[in-house]
């Protein structure tokens, strides 16, 4: 089974649009393929723009006018019959399913795994009502995954120097690195 480590940047919290989709596919022979898509959208909520720094104008340039539908065949094929691993799977899957439904496509992955939910009882970070969901940087710290290593691996995988936090390329690589660190530490994870 191929494993797809994935992250999205979006127009906001409600299922609007995905503005950036990045993932790393790790095949059964441990070979890796990295993909990054930028999508042109009509509107980005101000709070979302503050987080990821992408305006409608910037996205139009980065995407060269492409929208999600232009990548839907590739995305469907890549996620088909896979294990999709994300940090907050409910959020990413909701946006992906919404975008795919607009293209008359069904969710193609076989199963999902959420590092955020899985590691909540392991990290035991205090919250207002029991343990809080760990942020990705908190999980990285717990698993001893330095941001510099993630940045270097993301640059290598995606072939660019322009990778930073709240960039889906960085975040999906961080999920990959955390997952691999957890496996190396002997923590039980799906494979």
Model-identified regions with their sequence ranges:
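Conserved non-catalytic scaffold segment of RNase H-like nuclease domains
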Residues: 1-109, 138-145
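Residue-level "edge-of-site" marker
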Residues: 62, 113, 153
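Acidic, Mg2+-coordinating catalytic module of metal-dependent nucleases/exonucleases
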Residues: 80-90, 95-100, 129-191
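Short alpha-helix plus adjacent loop in nuclease-associated cores
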Residues: 113-131
């Amino acid at each position: 089974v191929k494993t797809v480590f994935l992250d999205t940047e979006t127009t906001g919290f409600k299922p609007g649009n995905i503005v950036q989709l990045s993932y790393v596919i790790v095949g059964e022979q441990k070979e890796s393929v990295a993909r990054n898509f930028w999508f042109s959208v009509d509107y980005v909520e101000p709070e979302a723009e503050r987080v990821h720094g992408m305006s409608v104008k910037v996205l139009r340039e980065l995407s060269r006018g492409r929208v999600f539908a232009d990548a839907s065949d590739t995305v469907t094929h890549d996620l088909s019959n896979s294990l999709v691993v994300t940090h907050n799977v409910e959020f990413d899957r909701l946006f992906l399913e919404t975008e795919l439904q607009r293209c008359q496509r069904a969710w193609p992955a076989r199963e999902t795994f959420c590092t955020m939910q899985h590691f909540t009882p392991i990290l035991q970070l205090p919250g207002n009502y029991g343990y809080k969901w760990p942020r990705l940087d908190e999980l990285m710290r717990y698993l001893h995954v330095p941001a510099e290593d993630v940045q270097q691996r993301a640059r290598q995988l995606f072939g660019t120097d322009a990778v930073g936090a709240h960039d889906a390329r960085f975040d999906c690589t961080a999920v990959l690195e955390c997952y691999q660190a957890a496996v190396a530490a002997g923590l039980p994870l799906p494979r």
